[in-house]
C-alpha cells in the first residue's frame, strides 16, 4: 500500500504564526431551515483557522468536509465552526463566514452569518445589507434660502434637493436568533425612503415626495440604524458595526460614515435624551 506523506504537518521554512489559513468563496447548495420553513440556497463559504509557527499548512480538505447539506439558518456558521474543530486539533481559533441572498418583502438582501474567535469562546455575528434613497438636508435648506431671497418663492415642509442611492449594512453580534427580518426593517426605515424594483409614475412621485420629507446625511443614516439596533436587546451588550455609503449624484465621489461600538455604549450616549 502506498504511503502518503503528511506534508501539511511538516515544519515550515520560516516558523512564523499565521492568523488565518483556509478557503474562500467555496460555493454549494444547502437547505436552510428558518422560522418553521425551509428553502434551498446557494451559499458562499469562507473558512479559516490559525496556524502555529511549527506547522506548514492546514488540511484543506477538512474545511470542505465540515460543510454539510442542511442547517438551521441561525446556526449555520456556528455548526460549521464546531464541525471543523472536531476534525483538527492543531489550531486555537477560527473564522467561518456563510453568505447568501435572503428573500423578504419581494426584495433580495445580502446576508452573512459569521462565527469566529477562540474555539472555547466562539462569537456569532449577522450582517445584513440594504439599499435606500437619501436626500441632502444641507442642499435643501440652501435652495430654500436662495428661492426665498432671489425669487421670492417660499416652500413649505417639502423643499428641493439632490438625492443619493445609499447602501447601508449592519453587523451585530447575536446569541441564538439572527432576527433577519428585524434587521432588514431597521435598515429600510433608516433611509429617507427605501428603494423599489418597479415604480409606476404616481408611485414614483409619491416616493420622491416622501423622501424629501425626511432629508438625511449619510451620518444620520448610521446613527439611526445604531440607535434602533441598540434597543433590540436592551438588556444585552453586543458588538455592532454600522456602515453607510451614499453614491453621490452631484459629485464624482461618495459619502461614507461608520459606527463601530457596543450596544450598551450606544444606549448610554442617549440615556439623557
Swiss-Prot record:
Cofactor: Fe(2+)
Known EC number: 3.5.4.39
Gene Ontology molecular function: GTP cyclohydrolase I activity; GTP cyclohydrolase IV activity; iron ion binding
Catalytic activity: GTP + H2O = 7,8-dihydroneopterin 2',3'-cyclic phosphate + formate + diphosphate + H(+)
Keyword S-adenosyl-L-methionine: no
EC top class, as a word: hydrolase
Alphabetic keyword roster: Hydrolase, Iron, Metal-binding
Keyword match Magnesium: no
UniProt record, GO biological process: tetrahydromethanopterin biosynthetic process
Cited Pfam families: GCHY-1 (PF02649)
Cofactor note: Binds 1 Fe(2+) ion per subunit.
Record pathway: Cofactor biosynthesis; 5,6,7,8-tetrahydromethanopterin biosynthesis
Annotated positions for site May be catalytically important: 136
Purpose: Converts GTP to 7,8-dihydro-D-neopterin 2',3'-cyclic phosphate, the first intermediate in the biosynthesis of coenzyme methanopterin.
Assembly with partners or alone: Homodimer.
Family that this chain belongs to: Belongs to the GTP cyclohydrolase IV family.
Protein's UniProt name: GTP cyclohydrolase MptA
Native organism: Picrophilus torridus (strain ATCC 700027 / DSM 9790 / JCM 10055 / NBRC 100828 / KAW 2/3)
